Each structure stands twice: as structure tokens, then as C-alpha cells.
Amino acid sequence: MAAQLNPFRNAFRLPSKQRINWFPGHMTKGMRQIQQKLRNVDCIVEIHDARIPLAGRNSQFFDTITGSGVKPHILVLNKVDLLGAKQQKSVLQQLRRQQPELQHILFTNCKDQRNNGVLDILPLATRLVSESSRFNRTQAAEHNLMIIGVPNVGKSSVINVLRNVHLKKKSAARVGAEAGITRSVGERIKIQENPPVYMIDTPGILQPSIKDDEMGMKLALVGCLPDHIVGEDLIADYLLYWLNSHRKYDYVEMLKLSSGPSDDISAVLAEYAHREELFHKVKQYDGRVEVMTNLLAAARKFIHFFRSGQLGHMNLDEPSGFR
């Protein structure tokens, strides 16, 4: 069968001289604090966004944290409701091809406290700790779990859900819908009485330099970077590129585009903004005020449709639908 030609862009390129990097001072401080506390940590729980199972995971950093596999390690892919159940098997295959040593992977949805993945975290961690050698630990009766991962993947939410499920207590870790809410390594938070289990929340940490532009755009699209670092217009353009390259055209109906799929983000946003009456006043150089379509508001709406799952289930790391 002949390969289907791609009528859209076959690659996404950033504007000239633009690079995606976000490594504020609190990340450097957080890395230092994490390494200082590792001595008394029994198990590493890595939280990541299920929609980007590969993008943004710094294997070198995690090797350092886990002592190249000496400390037990659980990978928790959160926000699985936005990935979808049908894609879980292929995600597991992707991960194990890239990182064969990964043995313990859970899918979680912190919006559902009865989610099996959430409920499996503590029993699995407890078993792994009991089976491992616990070096430099003076209080063997306690289990200390450290939560790590990139920003805005639900690390604090996981802690709060586990605390509520096992202790029936309210939230203890700050959460938010944007990257960078947790800015330092926190104190131990108790999440279980018997045996005593504590969790240590940590700030989201990215690679100091993101050399792969598309990986950076994936991180931006799911919200691991603050939107203003990259720009909503560029994030919306990458979303359009990704949807087209994977033959996912539900956005046409969602945005009510009259001309069908398009590769022109400016035209897409302009048509949507006009239809939804998204306008703003712009003062011109001569003092006149003109009413214009608000492309930024339209871009934010488009991104919201993706992040809320209204465009369907997505694995941003799946291969393109075109060859």
C-alpha cells in the first residue's frame, strides 16, 4: 500500500533564535535539597504526565536519585483520564523499549480517589521497601517516600489523595493548575499510620537545557512550563501541527471551521475568534482605537480544549500518522 502523503507541515520549527528553556533558581535549590535528603529515603516515586510518557523524563537525573537502581523506583503516569484506557498498553511498550529496567509502572487519575492506580501506590511501595536493602536508615519501622518529577504533573495532588484515602485527612501539599507551585523540598507528610509512611514533596525539575525543540513544545502543551515562557500563540500552533500530523481532526468540529483542517494557525484562530465574538480594542499609533479579533483569547481556548480532554485522548509521544 502506498504511503499517504502529508498535506501539512512535516516538521515543527521554532521561530529563528527562539529556544525553550525554563530552569529558575528554585530548581537548582530543589536538586540540592533532594540530594541532601536522599540518605533517609526508602523509595522514589516519580510522577509524570501520561500524555507525554517519554518527553521530559531525565534518565540521568533519575539514575542519580535512585543510585542507578539501588533505591526502589515507581513510575506513576498521572492524568490517565486524558490518555485513555486504550492507549495504556502501547505506552507501556514505548517505555520499556526506551528504558528496559523500568519494572514498576502505575497509571493514576487523582480526580478519582477510587482509581486502582492511586490505591496501588502505597502497597507497591511498602512491598518494594520491605524487599530492598535499607542503607543508612536508623528508623527501620518508618517508610519515607520521595515524590519527584517535572512541574505540574500532579505530585502534590498524589500526596493529598493518598493522605485523604489512608488517613481521612485534608490536603497538606499546595496544588495549582500551573507549573512552579511547589518551590522547595517540603517536610515529611504522613500518609499512613501502620506501618508509618511519610512522603516528601519536591519541586518539579526540568532539564537545565532542553535541546529537543519538539520535546520542549510537548512539555509546554501539557502545562509543564508556564504558558508565558513559550507563548500561547506558539503553543496553539504546535497543537495544530500535532493534531494534523496525527490525523486527528476533531478540532475542526470543535472550532466550527468552515474550510476543514488547516495548517495556518492564524487563520484558524481568526475564524474561531470571529465566530465566538472574541474581540478586543487596540489603540493604533495615530490614537485611533480599533476593535479587532482577539487571537490570544482564541489560542487560550484552543489550548484549554486540549488540556481538558475535549479534543479526545492523546499520547503526544506516539509516532506521526503520516510516513
Swiss-Prot record:
Residues the record lists as binding GTP: 78-81, 152-157, 204
GO biological process, one term: mitochondrial translation
Source domain of life: Eukaryota
GO CC field: mitochondrial inner membrane; mitochondrial matrix; mitochondrion
PROSITE patterns listed in its UniProt record: G_CP (PS51721)
Main location per the UniProt record: mitochondrion
Disulfide bonds, paired cysteine numbers: none
InterPro entries: G_CP_dom (IPR030378), GTP-bd (IPR006073), GTP-bd_ortho_bundle_sf (IPR023179), GTPase_MTG1 (IPR016478), P-loop_NTPase (IPR027417)
Modified positions (Phosphoserine) in chain numbering: 308, 320
Molecular function in Gene Ontology: GTP binding; GTPase activity
UniProt function note: Plays a role in the regulation of the mitochondrial ribosome assembly and of translational activity. Displays mitochondrial GTPase activity.
Family membership: Belongs to the TRAFAC class YlqF/YawG GTPase family. MTG1 subfamily.
Protein's name in the database: Mitochondrial ribosome-associated GTPase 1
Organism expressing this protein natively: Drosophila melanogaster
Lineage, opening ranks: Eukaryota, Metazoa, Ecdysozoa, Arthropoda, Hexapoda
